[in-house]
Swiss-Prot record:
InterPro entries linked: UreF, UreF_sf
GO molecular function term, any single one: nickel cation binding
Function text: Required for maturation of urease via the functional incorporation of the urease nickel metallocenter.
Cell location: Cytoplasm
Lineage of source species: Bacteria, Pseudomonadati, Pseudomonadota, Gammaproteobacteria, Pseudomonadales
Family to which the UniProt record says this protein belongs: Belongs to the UreF family.
Subunit structure: UreD, UreF and UreG form a complex that acts as a GTP-hydrolysis-dependent molecular chaperone, activating the urease apoprotein by helping to assemble the nickel containing metallocenter of UreC. The UreE protein probably delivers the nickel.
Gene name, Swiss-Prot/TrEMBL: ureF
Keywords assigned: Chaperone, Cytoplasm, Nickel insertion
GO CC annotation terms, alphabetical: cytoplasm
Taxonomic source organism: Pseudomonas putida (strain W619)
Protein name: Urease accessory protein UreF
One Pfam family per UniProt: UreF
Covalent S-S links between cysteines: none
Amino acid sequence: MNSDLALLRLLQLASPGLPVGGFTYSQGLEWAVEAGWVRDIKSFSAWQREQMNDTLAYLDWPVLARLYYACKADDADAFARWSRFLLANRETAELRLEEQQRGAALARLLDGWQLGQAPAWRPSLELSQLGGMAWLAVHWSIPLRQLALGHAFAWLEGAVMAGVKLVPFGQQAAQTLLRDLGEILPGVIDQALALGDDQLGGGLPLLAIASSRHETQYTRLFRS
């Protein structure tokens, strides 16, 4: 696949139009706003920076790399192992359910394209969205670093759009946040992709608490 087509496929994977429910989750932000932990643009930005540096950099993006390499090596056992590792590191029932719901949605999309149907791969593809993205990236010849950057921006855009509804702030502020927080992503991605297996795993206690409390929050805009 030529580089232009690979870029277009990456944009498709990172698009908010990808039918995996990306904008239906707040990942604890809804409770954090209600609790007063996030109350303005400054505290929202700090909340997202913490997630990028302490969770995504040590879990999501290095695991994405391992899923990608497993697909390139046609190693279904390694793919299954890292898919389970990712799910096990989701600290709340809500976050685990979100991961599985996103994974199942992307797996259904693959079904429609008659891709990823081998019995050794199909059950693992349902466990996480990252697994399906890695599988498609290898199938479409998308380079790993570009895939990680695409996933990172899609995550950031989803978080900022949730902030627009919850904090709230306007579209000008949202675009400024995307610009400023986006500047951090290349360096964080480089750090994440350089980690060894024994360095993986990260979590934020406040995020876990916020997600747990969101499960029983009385009034919610976002899915639990």
